[in-house]
Amino acid sequence: MEQNHQNLQSQFFIEHILQILPHRYPMLLIDRVVELEANKKIVAYKNITFNEDVFNGHFPDKPIFPGVLIVEGMAQTGGFLAFTSLWGFDPEIAKTKIVYFMTIDKVKFRIPVTPGDRLEYHLEVLKHKGMIWQVGGTAQVDGKVVAEAELKAMIAERD
């Protein structure tokens, strides 16, 4: 049953994120949610380390975190916002749902992300109707925009 969770906690640690999102290593791209306002906005981050497997090939002599993974991190953050806005922190319901991204628009990459960076995802709800959510925002390092995008997603039953 869809609900509106305005009094949701605003911070979630990795143990909470793992109970809501289905992603796992190496594709879980959120370490912590530091701000969440249901139906409105979310701020989360991932610490980028030299130990990321992706740096073995992108690029061995000049490691740059791939832009597509930045967008995926934004998508996961938006999915976390949509789910918790509808059902709050409910791991049992999370086992029955999955977020599918439908469109990714207006993507721009501005500054490379490298090991040692704390990659922050700042997203806000642009609109939503039922299980369809549109979010937009930026990825930032040290307050500087490194990427931006708009994403549309659908929450579906997990089969």
From Swiss-Prot:
GO terms for biological process: fatty acid biosynthetic process; lipid A biosynthetic process. GO terms for molecular function: (3R)-hydroxyacyl-[acyl-carrier-protein] dehydratase activity. It is an enzyme of class 4 (lyase). It holds the Pfam family FabA. Keywords: Cytoplasm, Lipid A biosynthesis, Lipid biosynthesis, Lipid metabolism, Lyase. It comes from the Bacteria. GO terms for cellular component: cytoplasm; membrane. It is found in: Cytoplasm. Its EC number is 4.2.1.59. Transmembrane segments: none annotated. InterPro entries: FabA_FabZ, FabZ, HotDog_dom_sf. The active site is at H58. It catalyses: a (3R)-hydroxyacyl-[ACP] = a (2E)-enoyl-[ACP] + H2O. Involved in unsaturated fatty acids biosynthesis. Catalyzes the dehydration of short chain beta-hydroxyacyl-ACPs and long chain saturated and unsaturated beta-hydroxyacyl-ACPs. Belongs to the thioester dehydratase family. FabZ subfamily. HAMAP family: FabZ. NCBIfam families: fabZ, PRK00006.1. This is 3-hydroxyacyl-[acyl-carrier-protein] dehydratase FabZ. The lineage of its organism: Bacteria, Pseudomonadati, Campylobacterota, Epsilonproteobacteria, Campylobacterales.
